[in-house]
Amino acid sequence: MAVPARRTSKAKKNKRRTHYKVAAPTVKFDETTGDYSRSHRVSLKGYYKGRKIAKAASAE
């Protein structure tokens, strides 16, 4: 079984890990409801692309 000849330094390890990051979610302003919501999803008030397609979620 292969074994590393040298220990990986902190700098080398951190340079490799620079691409391991979480992308911020895409948020858009919905002019119909006046709220911010995620793209391609129904808003909490039941609107999608400016049209009402579902009942609003109730706060139980």
From Swiss-Prot:
GO terms for cellular component: large ribosomal subunit. Signal peptide: none annotated. It comes from the Bacteria. GO terms for biological process: translation. GO terms for molecular function: structural constituent of ribosome. InterPro entries: Ribosomal_bL32, Ribosomal_bL32_bact, Ribosomal_zn-bd. Keywords: Ribonucleoprotein, Ribosomal protein. It holds the Pfam family Ribosomal_L32p. Belongs to the bacterial ribosomal protein bL32 family. This is Large ribosomal subunit protein bL32. It comes from Streptococcus suis (strain 05ZYH33).
